């Protein structure tokens, strides 16, 4: 393991770029939402509400991760189609966050209206996962686009 020769002060971690700092804050909430849904909420729901066994929940989540990876791998092509060949901009990430918020609200509405829990939660979160994977790719692209080359490792990390 290689250790850094110079320790970075906390104040140096924040970028001088407003765009990088805003995107970093957005990424914190983006990944926090993913963890709440997929690390806590979905496994508990599948087990407690649908009566799935530990093995069924684990198998489902394993398939979920594989599917998420597939969407991530296809994200450049999907985004290229959605953007008509253009490159993602800050507004693209904002739109993705808005769609994620709408999907979350629709899932809550579906549960509140006593619609089928399986359809409402699992299918709703499948759409959430698809949009999340695309938005995560946009964030990854933007952080590199906004970063000066000598600060890339610090900003991406």
Please report, for each region that a protein language model flagged, where it lies by residue.
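Loop-to-transmembrane helix entry/capping segments in MFS-fold secondary transporters
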Residues: 54-55, 147-157
């Amino acid at each position: 393991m290689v250790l850094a020769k110079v320790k970075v002060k906390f104040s140096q971690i924040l970028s001088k770029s407003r765009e990088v700092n805003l995107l970093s804050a957005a990424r914190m909430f983006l990944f926090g939402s993913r963890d709440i849904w997929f690390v806590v909420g979905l496994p508990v729901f599948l087990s407690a509400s649908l009566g799935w066994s530990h093995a069924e929940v684990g198998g489902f989540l394993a398939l979920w991760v594989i599917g998420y990876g597939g969407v991530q791998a296809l994200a450049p092509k999907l985004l290229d189609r959605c953007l008509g060949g253009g490159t993602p901009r800050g507004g693209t990430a904002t739109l993705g966050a808005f769609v994620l918020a709408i999907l979350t609200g629709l899932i809550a509405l579906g549960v509140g209206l006593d619609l089928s829990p399986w359809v409402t939660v699992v299918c709703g979160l499948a759409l959430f996962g698809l949009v999340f994977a695309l938005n995560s790719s946009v964030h990854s692209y933007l952080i590199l686009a906004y970063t000066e080359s000598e600060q890339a490792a610090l900003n991406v990390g």
